[in-house]
Amino acid sequence: MKKENTAIRLKRIMSDRNLRQVDILNLTEPYCKKYDVKMNKSDISQYCSGKTEPNQDKLFILGIALNVSEAWLMGFDVPMARAKQVSDEDIGDIFANDNLFEVIDNI
């Protein structure tokens, strides 16, 4: 169930971590480049004010940049922490290893 919205969650992160909107934008920059997503000051301002909600791409970027779950950032009553991501290296190990369950247990 959705209890809050993205604006409330962003404001909470900003307060808890002593961040400004420009700091959030700076944190997103490397991920925006990596995933070819454009985000600017106006976007962050509108998300923080509640005027608009981020689309799926921008929500993903905000989630990884702030190290929070996208569902939490959207306002759902779920844990704030991101689930552990499986890296390309982990996937390579899975396919190269005969003992699949051992590799999965170590992820």
List the model feature ranges, each with a label.
Residues 1-30, 34:
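A short, Lys/Arg-rich alpha-helix, primarily the initiator
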Residues 10, 24-25, 44-47, 73:
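Conserved hydrophobic/aromatic packing and binding residues within compact polymer-binding modules
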Residues 21, 41, 56-59:
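Helix-turn-helix DNA-binding elements, focusing on the entry/boundary residues of the two helices
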Residues 30-54, 76-78:
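Recognition helix of helix-turn-helix/homeodomain-like DNA-binding domains
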Residues 55-72:
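DNA major-groove recognition helix of helix-turn-helix/homeodomain DNA-binding modules
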Residues 79-107:
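Interfacial/linker helices and their anchor residues that mediate assembly or domain coupling
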